[in-house]
Amino acid sequence: MHAEVSRITLNIAQRSRALRDDYRRQIDEMSRQPVHRSQLSCGNLAHGVAACGSADKSVIKMMDSANIGIVTAYNDMLSAHAPYAGYPEQIKSALNAIGCTAQVAGGVPAMCDGVTQGQPGMELSLFSRDVIAQATAVSLSHQMFDAVLMLGICDKIVPGLVMGALQFGHLPTLFVPAGPMTSGLSNKEKVRVRQLYAEGKVDRAALLEAEMASYHSQGTCTFYGTANSNQMVLEAMGMQLPGSSFVNPDTTLREALTTEAVEHIAKIARTGRQALPLAEVIDEKSFVNGIVALLASGGSTNLCIHLVAMARAAGLVITWSDFDELSKVTPLLAKIYPNGSADINHFQAAGGTGLLFGELIKAGLMHGDAKVCFGGTLDAACIEPFLDEGHLQWRPAATASLDTDVIRSADKAFAPEGGIRLLEGNLGRSLIKSSAVAADRQTITAPAVVISHQNELRALFERGELDRDCVVVARFQGPAANGMPELHQLMPILGVLQDRGHAVALVTDGRLSGASGKVPAAIHVTPEASKGGVIGRVQDGDLVAINVASGELNVMVDEDVLAAREQARAPAPRSTVGRALFAFNRNLVTDAESGGCTLFEAPVLVDEPIEAATQSVAYGHCVS
């Protein structure tokens, strides 16, 4: 293993020891005193099987065959989740064929951030992750199941499902993906039309035509945003079958992979011979693997919030410093839009996850000995599925890229460091997605343009007041202010200004869509403005400096002057479109670096760094 990866992994384990021990005690208690249908009263069990057919009733009450719980995020408005409509019946049929059963344990909400971008509903988006975690726990609380299949893909859905599933870590769990839509209008062309619309050079009809040509069918959006980053991370953590993430919906291979996942879950269920509880798989190694895969592929910054919350649900404490330190030793091996012109289908065709993970394991950057939920270890999961006369088979993944413009080997990386960096300074701590930003754009010092709402920037642009170098400071967009919405609507305007030759950047305590790219954006600023952060004392015209190479984020104002300034007043919270129901979330939520979470308190960090010399003893690997 690479010395730094081992050190960071050990630091996570050490700082998490008390929380992790508590988590394991909770799981051990559920294992020793089975939270299971065998412990239900006759009345309880009768209610649990009342809606089943007579054959399923007979199997379930015998207790010796697996009954699988399905937690589904299906709805037919969300393109990525629409394919799930028929999955429960396919799952039940496949299980019945091997003498097992399944029940839909529950459904969870699934927002589409593409629908809510720039709309009031976006203020519910981050909080929906915690609602999904709670809904997952409610679904599994009936104690009817021997294992779990999760049907979910998109932005907050996967993190929420993982967080909920980890509370039932005594149960084996697998995710079942549905795959990306086929390639439509290129992402680059879509963004070009968006910028033309922002400038008033094309009308709404032309914009809608371009958008609908890009988002055109069932399946995940093809850009490498949060949804596809979720899929990359799930596979890297061993939570779904190898090579299954990016197979298109409504194909024979997709259907075969779903059946294969069903057969695997029956084998590793509590009733099976190869029982493999989720809590035995998900640990500090699996989280480091997920982070490294994210960084090497230039994935979404949203995962820097979600992985922290997911880890906390497993009794582990991950910080942004872990992301930053891993990024410094993880080369960028993939170029997928917005980091390049290729989409996720091109990535799959170039070699996909098996090639990427194989390169990272070979470089000592991923823990190849980490367990995976379907049995075995990650290094044995660098394989890819294919059909041979209609039957699913597996073969070794490609060991050389089939398109070096999309995936490269570690020794010929696109960049020596990963795609996400930590920035620090008198404005606080922040993250920047550097992989999509040109090298000559990664340092900027320019006057601040301060806004408290996305619409303010459009008004300034339309009045011609932004035709200059500037750093847009979007404050009061953090978790406690308004739920930390994504501010993707700002990017077409900033992209236009950049294309006109101006030096522009964004600094915000809010989030950005995983699709955001070429404009440098210091996001997730902590402390946020509504919690007294310095970002709330920045004024129009202040010079703001971003330097990715040195990891600095500062407002160039004397500290005494800053301290003497009155904190800006937060806008009054809005209560329409359901936002009144989430007031308690805004009051309870932790800061962005603690996961923007309402379910767990922010941990008190006491780091005792591990020296490199001890690493080989702890993990049994040679330090290289």
Language-model-detected regions and their locations in the chain:
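N-terminal small/polar loop signature for handling phosphorylated ligands or for N-terminal nucleophile
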Residues: 105-143
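Catalytic or ion-coupling anion/metal-binding cores of large enzyme and transporter domains
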Residues: 1-66, 72-76, 80, 89-108, ...
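Contiguous domain-boundary segments centered on the initiation and propagation of an alpha-helix
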Residues: 129-136, 143-148, 458-466
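Glycine-rich beta-alpha loop segments
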Residues: 84
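A short, small-residue-rich loop immediately preceding and capping a beta-strand
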Residues: 139-161, 174-176
